[in-house]
Amino acid sequence: MMVHNYCAPENVTAPPHVSRVTQYNKRGIRMISKVTWRVAWESDLTNGDHAELSDFFKSVYGATGAFNALPFAGGRSWAGARPELRGIAYDESGVAAHMGVLRRFIKVGGEQIAVAELGLYGVRRDLEGLGIGHSTLAMLPVLKALGVPFAFGCFRNELRIHFQRFCRNGKGAIVDNVNIKSTQPDIYPDLPPTKIEKKAAVILPLTETLDRWPEGVDIERNGPEL
């Protein structure tokens, strides 16, 4: 049986993380942009922060379909479960990238385990080279300080290549065809209260090794997706 000692928020700190990424101006000229990462607890964000993130998500997720931008209306900066912690990248144009984190217990093959769930991935569309790998690398010291054995996140197929690159050399593992059971983010009279989706998931070892991850492809969140 695993024993988990969670860190208090004040024990979780991160040094400034600066990335240099490629952009192109309106003339197609290659430029290098400096991006600075901020790690913020949810209760430290202001209404202005949420409004700025809301606009960011509407732009990023709306590009894949107007329906995907709807959860972020009215200054809302989350779609399902609300993050506990956020990694936010800024450049001279504002929010450049985002990754949300939420500690929770999930069930994997019927076995309960504590994880730091990753979600709300986003990169501004005009940036090139600031992928999920950069986001994960910037957040890794913080994730390791949270006192949970693994980080876990589901992802769309378009993000597979980014996670595959990051997981090289044993940094993590990708599990395909996982059956994820989640609650709906709200009450919908015409829908059941839970849903099951088949997705791919990434597992990152934090305080345990990958061989300690439970076997099984059935995962229960016991809550909405981050």
Swiss-Prot record:
Where it sits in the cell: the answer is:
Cytoplasm
Entry EC no(s)? 2.3.1.-
Q: Which keywords fit this entry according to its UniProt record?
A: Acyltransferase, Cytoplasm, Nodulation, Transferase
Q: Name one Pfam family in it.
A: NodA
- Enzyme group, top EC level? transferase
Pull one GO CC term from this UniProt entry: cytosol
**UniProt family annotation:** Belongs to the NodA family.
Domain of life from the UniProt record: Bacteria
Against Gene3D superfamilies, the record matches this protein to:
3.40.630.30
**Protein role:** N-acyltransferase required for nodulation. Acts in the production of a small, heat-stable compound (Nod) that stimulates mitosis in various plant protoplasts.
> Could you tell me what this protein is called?
Nodulation protein A
Give GO MF terms, alphabetically: acyltransferase activity
The record's annotation in PROSITE patterns points to: NODA
- Using the record for this protein, list the coiled-coil segments as residue ranges, or answer none: none
What InterPro entries does this protein map onto? NodA, Nodulation_prot_NodA_CS
